[in-house]
């Protein structure tokens, strides 16, 4: 459901997604669904991203578009500034320059209120958007694959953050949630 950015941040979010310049509606919908499943408070689509109400995006979200906070944002720089002012740490998903995700977790970075900044499917985040983040973080690739699909990388990052938030809140870090 559409919400203003101020309403999202006014509710003290712990986990937020910023989709910057995401163009593929299937990936965007899958990111929405993954964010919802990981317990994120909202997903922000930058002004240069695909329309989240594109029919392919809605289908790929499998209904999550209707029950996660959805912000139709403006310029990424303004969005990042607003989120930082609301107390969120902004992490840029970047496999080229980022510290490995498995090194960020033990430092406690992921347990803080976090906004994940994800870029375009084809070329990731440009340098000007990378510079907006508090730090770049990448999903390590142990095999021969060149990279991960946007939705796959988002899933790894969001679930790792969700686990860190649960552990930080005193929850059982190893508990398996009940399935539906």
Residue ranges and their predicted role:
Residues 71, 77-84, 91, 102, ...:
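Generic hydrophobic alpha-helical scaffold/packing signal
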Residues 2-98:
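RNA substrate-binding interface of SAM-dependent RNA methyltransferases
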